Amino acid sequence: MTLEIPRRQYVSNYGPTVGDRVRLADTELIIEVEEDFTTYGEEIKFGGGKTIRDGMGQSPTATRANGALDLVITNALILDWWGIVKADVGIRDGYIVGIGKAGNPNIQAGVTPGMVVGPSTEVIAGENLILTAGGIDAHVHFICPQLCEFAIASGVTTLLGGGTGPATGSNATTCTPGAWNLGKMLQAAEGFPVNLGFFGKGNAAFPAALREQVEAGACGLKIHEDWGSTPAVIDSCLQVADEYDIQTLIHTDTLNESAFVEDTIAAINGRTIHTFHTEGAGGGHAPDIIRIASEPNVLPSSTNPTRPFTRNTIEEHLDMLMVCHHLSKNVPEDIAFAESRIRPQTIAAEDILHDMGVFSIISSDSQAMGRVGEVIIRTWQTAHKMKVQRGPLPQDSSRNDNFRAKRYVAKYTICPAIAQGLSHVIGSVEVGKLADLCLWKPAFFGVKPEIVLKGGLIAYAQMGDPNASIPTPQPVYPRPMFGSFGRALTETSLLFVSQAALDLGIPEKLGIQRRAVAVKNCREIGKADLKLNTATPHIEVNPETYEVRADGELLTCEPAEVLPMAQRYFLF
């Protein structure tokens, strides 16, 4: 015997199912459920009078030793690069072990193998919540330790970059130079509930100092113009990267002193490289570094200060740039340097290139013109602006923006994971990946995650007054949870290093407690591997007007006057 209930009642109880649509925050972006992996009539739900009770949705015979889940997230709406689906998510030992239908196979039909709910299983109610992978920020200036708190509170669970604190070099460049500095930053990483990896300084025309840093634990090498991004440096750094299977990251020569963009492309010589702020406002060959996004071996990213193009973007950038790159308003050449980087034409084109899937990654450039807590917000603001200005993508329809949503979520999850050699352990909601996950109320999607899981344990969450009688009284704001403390922190977060550093026992020598994981497959990849962000049109820049064309089409758009996901959500 079956009972039919109204769709509205079903959604209220169990969350949206196939055909239901959900608005993302206060944007114009609508996603639609493509598939439901749960079984109608056999849904599991926790609570008084609900189904996750002994002998019902919870198996009385399932022990942890014989495979019961440690944690199940019930009836969540997963938004990931591979799909928009409704499912239960099963977690054991901090890793995702199942995406499907969880429950008690003794009495329920369709329980996915390995997704048995037992007495050992904790429950997070995912009904009417959106589940995404934790964000990855691959361009972090480690200027202050507090940025880790702001990142995880925003839904970012992995930070890659360089720095040693507010040193002048770190304020400008994402490099942790030398074995001693790397060792100290690897040790400092023990205290933060996020995955961390550090870039060595890649500016050396001879390889010895570069090898030294990789073997000391660097997970990548960063070339920055403030240290000299010459063709000799580029070639040397890429040779070492190929030798050790790590990524090279580059901020090219804005002043075109040692090379023009054509010379940099020639020095790269078809080898894989991750180009930072590829539009150029953050730095790089003026005015045409954006051309490099045409190259199939280039993994192009943006930083969030130019995401998206608004009426405030140009004015804000000049002062930020002067501070970040140790420039003086009293030196005319410094002012000219700054002004050469800020071009409304290329920033406008950057919006469209993201929407086309030409630019593949969005990161922060934290405290060095970018904001570490706004990677996710700025990504979805860009998607919204492009929906409003360009309409549905060819792959979408008037009903939903599913393809656009999947393309944009990939920009801060799977694409940086692939680019940096992390995708074997993080970057998506897939079986076998570390359970770094974010749960969002749709009205707060991309702005304030309800719960952030690190390695399967709640590390941050919206929480009310700790002295209240229930968890919900004001003030409600993101607070560190038990996954952010003690040995639980080191057991649920990773440290990314080179395979050479692992082989040399560097984590053990430094007394590192958290698990160190080697980056891999950084060199045999190209833009074609960056999910849903693979386009390589021919890009041209007019040297007089700075107009940008892709395959002959002029790329231009108006700056936004207002944006969603902004003042409506924040008091300050």
Curated annotation (Swiss-Prot):
Q: Does the keyword Cytoplasm apply?
A: yes
The reaction(s) this protein catalyses: urea + 2 H2O + H(+) = hydrogencarbonate + 2 NH4(+)
Q: Where, by residue number, does substrate bind?
A: 224
Per UniProt, subcellular location reads as: Cytoplasm
EC number from the UniProt entry = 3.5.1.5
Question: Out of the domains of life, which is the source?
Answer: Bacteria
Active site, renumbered: 325
**Binding positions for Ni(2+) 2 per the UniProt entry:** 222, 251, 277
Name one process (GO BP) from the record. urea catabolic process
Which residues are recorded as binding Ni(2+) 1? 139, 141, 222, 365
Entry keyword set: Cytoplasm, Hydrolase, Metal-binding, Nickel
In this chain the Urease domain maps to 134-572
UniProt xrefs under Gene3D superfamilies: Metal-dependent hydrolases, Urease, subunit C, domain 1
Q: Which GO terms describe its molecular function?
A: nickel cation binding; urease activity
Q: Which cofactor does it need?
A: Ni cation
Q: Which residues carry this modification: N6-carboxylysine?
A: 222
Q: What CDD domains does this protein map onto?
A: Urease_alpha
Q: Which InterPro entries match?
A: Amidohydro-rel (IPR006680), Metal-dep_hydrolase_composite (IPR011059), Metal_Hydrolase (IPR032466), Urease_alpha_N_dom (IPR011612), Urease_alpha_subunit (IPR050112), Urease_AS (IPR017950), Urease_asu (IPR005848), Urease_asu_c (IPR017951)
Task: Summarize the PTM comment.
Answer: Carboxylation allows a single lysine to coordinate two nickel ions.
Q: How is the cofactor bound?
A: Binds 2 nickel ions per subunit.
Coarse class of the protein's main subcellular location: cytoplasm
Q: Which GO terms describe its cellular component?
A: cytoplasm
Q: How does it assemble?
A: Heterotrimer of UreA (gamma), UreB (beta) and UreC (alpha) subunits. Three heterotrimers associate to form the active enzyme.
Q: Which family does it belong to?
A: Belongs to the metallo-dependent hydrolases superfamily. Urease alpha subunit family.
| Protein known as | Urease subunit alpha
The protein's organism comes out as Synechococcus sp. (strain JA-2-3B'a(2-13))
